Regions:
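Acidic/glycine-enriched connector segments
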Residues: 119-177
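Short gly/pro/ser/thr-enriched loop/turn and capping motifs at secondary-structure boundaries
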Residues: 141-147, 184, 212-215
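Active-site/ligand-binding-proximal alpha/beta "capping" segment
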Residues: 159-211, 255-260
């Protein structure tokens, strides 16, 4: 991570050196001025430069999180990311299901990636920690500190959600989504969007808990598909499987099929999740 004082000073100096050019090229290739449309600044120039410098510093920190996390996560592939609620208690059936699934995935040769916190995240790490492959936690620093669970062979701390979510997607060959709240839904739809738009290759997105997910899936079919906002093929991106052994079979079948394309794709680790 870059030294904060040095990085901020560098960003501040860079901000002071920038001279704003109000002329831009429009879609017709003509040079146009934005001055007539730009609002009058509400803050003094010095204050705005300081804010810009701090924003530049945050960009540097985000880049450093990408680089550092990427280097560490290369060693743990292939991996499966498991999403789910931080509030699920240890005696809940979803916790116990996740614990068993993660252990089986770990013994089958897949590292297991979770958010590193309590609840479903803890169950995923705990199951993998007892198995043959690494348990990985992608921990996030929050205003109300998320306590990292103790079942992590590799623990990576993030200040920003953006690089953390990318690491969940980039370094996994499949995504298992347990019941959860806003954070889980965010991770689910992030994965769906990246696969749907081709920004990441097709990988299994497996929902666990028919009773929990059926209402959302019905709404997606009725409102999104029914209004033509998604294609019928987009529904095939989601699998609903409540049996842990069938989940592993689904992941293995997809992973082995992907390995057959290794010769065609060469060293494209993003495409293969390797």
């Amino acid at each position: 991570m870059p030294d904060e004082s040095i990085a901020f000073q560098t960003a501040s100096e860079h901000s002071n050196q920038i001279s704003y050019n109000p002329f831009r090229t429009n879609h017709k290739g003509k040079s146009v001025s934005l001055l007539k449309k730009l609002p009058k600044p509400m803050l003094p120039d010095e204050t705005r430069r300081e804010i810009q410098a701090r924003e530049s510093y945050h960009v540097l920190k985000i880049i450093s999180e990408f680089v550092e996390a990427g280097e560490e996560l290369r060693a743990i592939q292939p991996a499966v990311s498991i999403y789910g609620s931080a509030r699920t208690p240890e005696n809940h059936p979803d916790y116990e299901f996740t614990l068993r699934l993660a252990r089986k995935l770990s013994d089958a040769g897949f590292s297991v990636i979770s958010g590193g916190g309590p609840g479903i995240m803890e169950a995923a790490n705990k199951g993998a920690f007892a198995g043959a492959s690494p348990a990985v936690g992608l921990n996030i620093v929050l205003p109300h500190e998320q306590k990292a669970n103790p079942y992590q062979d590799l623990s990576i701390k993030f200040q920003h959600f953006f690089p953390r979510k990318v690491m969940f997607v980039k370094h996994a060959v499949a995504y298992v989504v347990m019941p959860g709240g806003f954070g889980t839904l965010d991770e689910l739809f992030e994965s769906l969007t990246l696969v749907q738009t081709g920004k990441t290759p097709n990988r299994p997105i497996i929902l666990v808990g028919g009773d929990f997910w059926s209402g959302l899936l019905d709404w997606i079919r009725k409102e999104l598909l029914g209004r033509g906002l998604i294609a019928a093929a987009d529904m095939d991106l989601i699998r609903l499987i409540d049996d842990e052994d069938k989940i592993i079979e689904e992941i293995f079948a997809h992973y082995e099929n992907r390995l057959e394309t290794l010769g065609e794709l060469g060293a494209d680790t993003w495409s293969l999740g390797l």
